[in-house]
């Protein structure tokens, strides 16, 4: 139940309907305990983690928002106002780069769910969508798994808000004849610096009295490929965001205060079918190969390397300032 599913359910419930929401992960409170356990022990729950659970991947990310000032329909403003009504800082309504923070976002997500339930909707956590039930060329229900049991639910309309990590769902949908096509995506590394360094670089001596500084970088390589920074997290941390056993993914997050010692940002490049193959799931398999290599390189932990060593393709023997 990421942002797409959450707001679809909210709009339907506000319109007087009673949607039934299936979320493969746990509610935000149980999910937080499971994620903390994973970070402390390395024991991954593939059904409830940084990717799956109430709020989606964003619950354990930075809580950054887009302003979409050119949004002609006003939908984005409505979303921001909804966040504020459910406990987000009012400043997100006017800040150039609005930010809720991981700590506050959990409370906001819980509050939105409570409104959805109060309007008559039903939410089933720890419940995995398995496949569509079809009668001819029409949907007549869904099959789902809950507590190890397969059940069915009749319905005439389904909104599949899968996010990007439910790979088993994509495979099942293909087998059922759902039309899909591969698309480009970004892949890269997380760069980490002392926040004080970024502040001095951006603000000089004024960094002492200004909010934590961020940065945005772009570059076009000699072969025309774009490289850019993404999801810069001032005063944040790099976290293990894996959702499949034996594979490793990282993400960055900041809490509302952004008062951590380090800053981090993704440095990514866009890749497409010309890089990983034209097959429908070639991009997905490309991701899995990278994730497995990262897992093996770090023996299940996040592999860390100095930037200079990374650029020279050599192993790091010591850490830097972070």
How does the language model describe each region?
Residues 1-322:
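Residues forming the flavin
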